[in-house]
Amino acid sequence: MQHARKKFRVGRTSAHNRCMLANMLKSLIHQERIETTLPKAKELRRCADKMITLAKKNTLAARRLAVARLMVRYNKLTSKEARQAKAGDLSAYNVDRTVINKLFDQLGTRFVSRNGGYTRILKLQNRVGDNARKCIIEFLAD
């Protein structure tokens, strides 16, 4: 029996979970709406609410915490990104910068008057292949 088990585990290692949630959180901040499975969305909601609370503070320490939690790479380019940068395409590299700026400049100011509950989960039909519960997670309008 596993009483009070609060960790998000779906058969992946902890490093994989951490990276997956960071990538999903970046996508959610960038697009403000993503489609995923219900267990992932419930865990993502916890992370997103914490990030918005950080963004509402809008201090240097809060920005540094957000960069660390989102695993943003400002000065490191992978070999693929380096090839793209030589060709003049920095889209993958600039997404991380725009995510942090959007989090603090737009989303943080949008939810200043709200004390919590910044996201909404809308349930969809189950996925055809494996019958997984699908949903849409999105930020509220204001």
UniProtKB/Swiss-Prot annotation:
GO terms for cellular component: cytosolic large ribosomal subunit. GO terms for biological process: translation. One of its GO terms (molecular function) is structural constituent of ribosome. The keyword Flavoprotein does not apply. It comes from the Bacteria. SUPFAM superfamilies: Prokaryotic ribosomal protein L17. Keywords: Ribonucleoprotein, Ribosomal protein. Pfam families: Ribosomal_L17. Gene3D superfamilies: Ribosomal protein L17 (3.90.1030.10). NCBIfam families: L17 (TIGR00059). Belongs to the bacterial ribosomal protein bL17 family. Part of the 50S ribosomal subunit. Contacts protein L32. This is Large ribosomal subunit protein bL17. It comes from Chlamydia caviae (strain ATCC VR-813 / DSM 19441 / 03DC25 / GPIC) (Chlamydophila caviae). The gene is rplQ.
